[in-house]
């Protein structure tokens, strides 16, 4: 499990990732050094990679898109 800070709302969200801690730390280092997220974490799906980048879960994205559609 990793934690991500959701900057937009200031909430802390969690997501379970099917990756061991050592691999996660290694790949995160590659991402932070400039590698594209999809290249650094090819074993993760789009939602999991988005969470690493933003701290936003799929449910939060869906609610944000729904609110935007209502405007």
Go through the PLM ranges and name each one.
Residues 7, 25-28, 35, 55, ...:
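Generic alpha-helical secondary structure signal
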Residues 21-50:
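Acidic, low-complexity, intrinsically disordered interaction modules
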């Amino acid at each position: 499990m990793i934690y991500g800070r959701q900057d937009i709302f200031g909430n802390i969200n969690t997501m379970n990732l099917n990756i061991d801690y050592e691999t996660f730390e290694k790949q995160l280092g590659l991402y932070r050094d400039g590698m594209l997220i999809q290249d650094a974490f090819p074993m993760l799906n789009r939602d999991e990679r988005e969470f690493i980048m933003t701290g936003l879960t799929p449910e939060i994205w869906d609610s944000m898109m729904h609110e935007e559609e209502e405007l």
